[in-house]
């Protein structure tokens, strides 16, 4: 690793730690630590939600898929873009209004508890446990990505990369809480944006423009330029269904709960979707132009997911290379920090305060939150020590698991007055169980149907049927629904 790359990465790591220190000085109570005091503006909300969402797949996974399979990968990008937009449009305003009306709910399990008027502690326990289990695995996957990045891009030891990435993320998350996570995600989102604009443009000019690029791709495999080639109706529907997962991702939708004002959601949506469309387009073009570049200049690409890293090393000065590689770290670290904090909030707010210390002071809760971040990080690191550990295979299904378990339950809670706690509990259990059964029985592979499709549909049906056959929600729950709708109309 050259000294220039070390300097670039050093500047990046120091900047993240300084932001954590700034947030630490601003954090005084549990609301600050978990939701930043509900003071996020539209720019920070939009970019932090995007950065928390995208992880390393944006700079490695999507370019790699485009390089290997061509334009058929666009169906996945389209599904995710539509899902993100509908999340801003359908879920964000009502969730922000409801959490404010519901005595400032600060976590998803806390929202469910207050939405249904503390009617069943089981609902809070189940939702908190789902978050803890899936996100601990999810976090370990991000840590593995960090270790592998150092190993493949810098020739460094896997464990060194793992520990370095984890140490920086844990420090700023542990001390700065939600504000640190959101501000670092904002900066990391900006870095990702710049990298995914710069790399494909420079690579494109090296290939020679539009005609030479298409000529080189056609020479490799003309089917790479056919969006329908190799994509059956089932696979297209499955790709598009990825968008359903957005409704149930706690680390993304918590940003909507933390925004300063409901009115800020509209500009946040415009900023967030502009960011996403440009970065997804840059990611797609990086992979596609990579095919042309590799063929024209005889570059050997053993692993398609390395194409962004290859471009970063070949086309740029080492100082810029360090900056571009820090964009991958930014994508990885932004997701790890968000997942760590959401998991810690489930431990602190939804288990510790709810069942052990109802009258705990803010100082005590912040301390428990910080300890939770540390403990969860240690567990995730232990799972990550072996990058080929089979337990990490489950992480790829977490998106479908969260989307199916929480998505229908949250949407029904926000739009249907008759929804009760037993319906929400049934939706969570059926959604999560369907995804697990679909995967473990081999139905996902044999049918080609992405597990979120049966999971989401059956979860929605279970939520409606169980709510209808069990007792109506308390009158206070109906009143709260009315307060939410009035607040929503007043703030629009």
Curated annotation (Swiss-Prot):
Disulfide bonds: none
Gene Ontology annotations of biological process type: proline transport; transmembrane transport
Record-given protein name: Osmoregulated proline transporter OpuE
Organism, as annotated: Bacillus subtilis (strain 168)
Keyword Translocase recorded: no
GO cellular component, as recorded: plasma membrane
Reaction equations catalysed: L-proline(in) + Na(+)(in) = L-proline(out) + Na(+)(out)
Family designation: Belongs to the sodium:solute symporter (SSF) (TC 2.A.21) family.
UniProt-listed NCBIfam families: Na_Pro_sym, sss
Pfam families found in the cross-reference section: SSF
Gene inactivation effect: Disruption of the gene eliminates the osmotically stimulated proline transport activity and practically abolishes the ability to use proline as an osmoprotectant.
Membrane topology: Multi-pass membrane protein
Localization per Swiss-Prot or TrEMBL: Cell membrane
Any GO molecular function: L-proline transmembrane transporter activity
Keywords assigned by UniProt, alphabetized: Amino-acid transport, Cell membrane, Membrane, Stress response, Transmembrane, Transmembrane helix, Transport
InterPro entries, per the entry: Na/Glc_symporter_sf (IPR038377), Na/Pro_symporter (IPR011851), Na/solute_symporter (IPR001734), Na/solute_symporter_CS (IPR018212), Sodium:Solute_Symporter (IPR050277)
Membrane-spanning residues: 3-23, 40-60, 62-82, 125-145, 161-181, 190-210, 224-244, 271-291, 314-334, 365-385, 394-414, 424-444, 449-469
Function of the protein: Catalyzes the uptake of extracellular proline under high-osmolarity growth conditions. Essential for the use of proline present in the environment as an osmoprotectant.
Induction of expression: Induced under high-osmolarity growth conditions. Has two osmoregulated and tightly spaced promoters. The first promoter is sigma A-dependent and the second promoter is controlled by the general stress transcription factor sigma B.
